[in-house]
Amino acid sequence: EMGIFGLMIPEEYGGLGESLLTYALCVEEIARGWMSVSGIVNTHFIVAYMLKQHGTEEQKAYFLPKMAAGETRGAFSMSEPHCGSDVAAIKSKAVRDGDDYVLDGQKMWLTNGGSSTVVAVLVKTDEGSDSVYRNMTTFLVEKPAGFGEVRPGLTIPGKIDKMGYKGVD
């Protein structure tokens, strides 16, 4: 009702169009009240911001109004079992198949995994530079909310029993 899911989404896409400073202050205040809720909205904000900054006009028109309304929730997956926080060491890849890409690999965590309907997945491609710090692309993968095999080849494990952040799936 407050429109918080659209905090940084431009008004033309149904959002509030607020600044990064306002975003930081909002997340700080939400975390002060309940850390898990800040994790839920912050991950959504990150995906919305990536789309706003780097998405095509078609992607923005398709995703941002639904994200601003809270109808579509964003999730982000980057870490992999073998590399921890060393993002350059990821091995998941996207291989071009005609006009499409096929994503292959395993991720360690998927914040908002069960509740999200669009996932930003960081993978390597074979296009461009030979540097391990380049050729990384974020793909948007639509999925139904829920756990288990939600799409062929995409399994969202159940909630992890964590010490903190218990409200974040």
Residues covered by each model-derived region:
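Internal helix-loop-helix
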Residues: 2-71, 112-118
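Short beta-turn/strand-loop junction motif enriched in small, turn-promoting residues
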Residues: 12-14, 79-83, 106-109, 124-128, ...
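A short, Trp-centered hydrophobic/proline-enriched beta-strand micro-motif
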Residues: 70-78, 122
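A structural signal for short hydrophobic beta-strand segments in well-ordered beta-sheet cores
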Residues: 92-95
